[in-house]
Amino acid sequence: MHAQYILKIQNAISIAISILDKIQAEQDLQKSSNLREALWHAAEESEYAAAVLSLSHGLTDFDPELREINVKKMTIRDQARLAKTFLQDSLALLGSKPKQSYEKLRYAVQVLRTIQAEIKRKPLESD
């Protein structure tokens, strides 16, 4: 993998992980006025990393779908924790197993998009 790509991917994943750390540190997620923006930012950083990884490794036809875990039955905090775990796994696999790294990235994006959809349906208490 070209060093220029790996650094961009690592940076984007690290930013997303940092954002999820901040989300998890919130005492009451339902009252967090910045939750929507933070989730959007984490999802976009993850999407960007996935796009760069996909294009740099010819994975455009590979579209993994998260099926084993019923994410919708989890709390927002647990969903954020799961997304963070997927991102950390992706980062660990990046240099040695890019296809599996991409798979974990796509799973993280799916979890983050699920959280965003739930928040859209169920407004935050501060709204």
Give the residues covered by each predicted segment:
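Long, charged/polar, soluble alpha-helical segments
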Residues: 1-127
